[in-house]
């Protein structure tokens, strides 16, 4: 797909910790699985809204390495939902110019899901409107540790080269904003390297409730902030003291 739009790495990179599916369902007397199903609908809404709001890369935290400790039935349901999403959304992603990448370990995923991931990535490889990264069996600390092990064999190393080892791709824009839903205020091992200078936005909204308006609110908050990346803002010179 060819396009003359702004290159994706010149647009915002937003990461979202999609939290609150289970609590959303419990408050409504529904099963936790129903909450995860509603969470998939929220993904569709935000993937559609993101390019319209200046986002070029969207990284969604779907399943952490620690989530394997959840009840087996819930994990199985999550894997089924992932496979369903991959199988049913690919045509829509291709149509809308979305390139899908799944980050995290794949060796522990069911074989059918690993194959579905590879197929979806191939099918959407030419998308140039939005880069959608879904983190599955993901740990930022593990990603950094694995990158360090690979870097040990190199004779020289730059920050850019190490970043490529961590993220698995060259030229990925650092994360500008990390959003977490459900009112929790922690990063939970998400994008620790590429989000080193990311702004943080926490909302009480549960992920199944999150919509384009909530995304716009998070981006408006981000735009009001002054990002100094460790430096100082320009301050007026103080007058010299009188002698």
PLM features: residue spans?
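Flexible, compositionally biased loop and terminal segments
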Residues: 1-243
